[in-house]
Amino acid sequence: MIKYLETIIESGLFEKIEKEKYIDALEQLTITGKKFNKGAAIFYEKDMIDRICIVNRGSVRSEKMYAGGEIHILELYEESAIFALEAAASKRRTSPADYICNEDTTIVFIPMASISRCTYKSEITDVLMQKLAGDNIKKTRKIEILGERGLRNRIMIYLDVLRKKEGSSVVTVKMNREQFAQYLCVSRSALSNELNKMKREKIIDFNKERFEIL
């Protein structure tokens, strides 16, 4: 659908296709869009996923719930991000986590089967493989964060990643405190206490989701 072309371009999916061929590639793919309300599940863990997903508007988080009811946030996907690729590209095609809308969100779906039939299959597949590699790097980075013993170190490493990404010492954590705590695998109270200590010690400053590394 032509209205999703800009989102698809921004996702990088067509980056190996010549610009004048974008419309041709778009018309060969089976593309649908769907709106979800905040808190709605796009997929649950173990659901079958046979399509790639791109955030058109809003944001999505992947999370896992453990036996005791504890929730860990794995990743946050913002506008134009591709997600659920590891499931769609796998042999079993089962979701490794729950994918939940962080806000009112619109998702673009592209079935893997339509990519396989597309004239530009090779170009698109190359991009998807690069995306998978990038996702693996992000997972490695999170393992490094969680491998830190001290909560303060975890916070600083995460903020430093955002600083490098945004090119500024003032960054935005697009999670509320509960979600940020779940991402760092700690309680909300522990996170709030540590953030307040760091603020008093003038290591960071913050107001809601806005953080500044001092």
Annotate each PLM feature.
Residues 1-38, 77, 82, 87-90, ...:
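Cyclic nucleotide-binding regulatory module and flanking cytosolic helices
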Residues 28-29, 47-49:
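Short, small/polar residue-rich loop motifs at catalytic or cofactor-binding pockets
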Residues 41-47:
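Short phosphate-coordinating micro-motif centered on Lys-Gly-acidic
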Residues 50-63, 79-80:
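Glycine- and acidic-residue-biased ligand/ion/polar-headgroup-sensing regions
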Residues 61-73:
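A short beta-strand-loop-beta hairpin characteristic of the jelly-roll/cupin
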Residues 73-130:
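Cyclic-nucleotide recognition modules
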Residues 102, 122-185:
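Polybasic "coupling" helices that flank or enter modular domains
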Residues 162-214:
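Phosphate-/nucleic-acid-contacting segments
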